Amino acid sequence: MHIGFFSDQHPATLGGLQVSLELQREHLQRRGHTVTVCAPNSKRTTSPSSAHTNDVHLASIQVGDHSFTLAGARFDATIDLAFANKPPVVCVHVQGDLWGAWNGYRFAARHNLPLIHTMHTNIEVGLPAILPFPRTVFRLLFAAQQRFLDATRVRTIAEYTRAFAERADILIAPSTHFAKHLHGYGIDKEIQVLPTGVDDELIQVLLSEPRAPRARPILLWPGRISQEKRISDFFEAFHQANVDADIHVYGSGVDLAHARKRVAELRLTHRVHFFGAVSHRRVLAAMRNADAVVQSSLGYETQGLTVYEAVSVGTPVILRDRSIAHDLPVEFSHMAADDSIDAFASIIRKFVQLKHESKVRLAASEQFTQSQLTIRLETLYRKAQEIHEHHPTHERFGGNQRAA
């Protein structure tokens, strides 16, 4: 099969979704399929290996770490021309919730193709976290949805999300808690839960390597350093916990300067170490060597990619957002009692004390191996084709998409 991935962000930029795209692509290709990603161009690519020359890159505007683009007739023509020189696409897999989704749905409608949509983003929380004037942004977003998807009425996030759901053959959520959240918008069709996976072979290599000695426990925080990730809350809680441990931060982002400043204000510079944006393999190796991986955001994550990776290399996780724990093995999860800094500090303190008392290392979980998840994804692609044969795109997608 030739699968067309449509994403809001370039696959070679920093972020959990981008890691997921590349891993899905790699494992689908191992099984004989072809994958082409259509996404905005970016000046912030971190991995040359992810910059596939056969992908379709759209003109975009760079704002911080994110690329912004649109949809419409000009983009339709660009996308169709690019795909015309490739094998025919048999299924569209939208892995975005903004311009990537608009372009993917329009492409599927023009070519009468089955469409699967993995809803990765909690837009209601995510957009206000990265953009100023959220009310204005949402009004523009809703207007764009009406125009580019020929939707009759979009005035709320629920209507925005349902407009996609009504047109998709299959919906996927990356976690149980986010699937429930989407159903809360009034989506009545079944939502498949398919988490982001981890690379089996790389995990096995890392598990075979010995862990490095350390003077004290290492608490690792990986990801994009931005306001919605609340890394400064982690520093506050760590300071309050007053434990004999080190923090290793892997990642970069627009909030890095503020994070460094907060570390200095709390007089933690001797305990907090910033390693910057490094390769995904190096982050996984650091997770393997850590005593715990820490998740500090609240209500933002649609899944727990970094904590999925952590348990896959046998490393426990300290969770502030308790909803993420639903899909994790119980023995790996150490959850804050509530959303407060006090509760966060308490679970950090309890975990470090536990590490002093117990030397037992948990066996790595195999729950999130990408090879197994890819087999499930293939099944969903075939199911989407069957559904589409009975309910073609044009029956759910009115209007002339070239005219928008």
Give, region by region, the residue ranges found by the protein language model.
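Carbohydrate-associated surface elements
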Residues: 177, 197
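A charged, aromatic-enriched C-terminal amphipathic alpha-helix characteristic of glycosyltransferases
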Residues: 353-392
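Conserved donor-binding/catalytic core segment of Leloir-type glycosyltransferases
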Residues: 172, 211-240, 248
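Nucleotide-activated donor-binding/catalytic signature segment of Leloir-type glycosyltransferases, i.e.
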Residues: 258-278
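Acidic donor-binding loop of glycosyltransferase active sites
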Residues: 169, 288-302
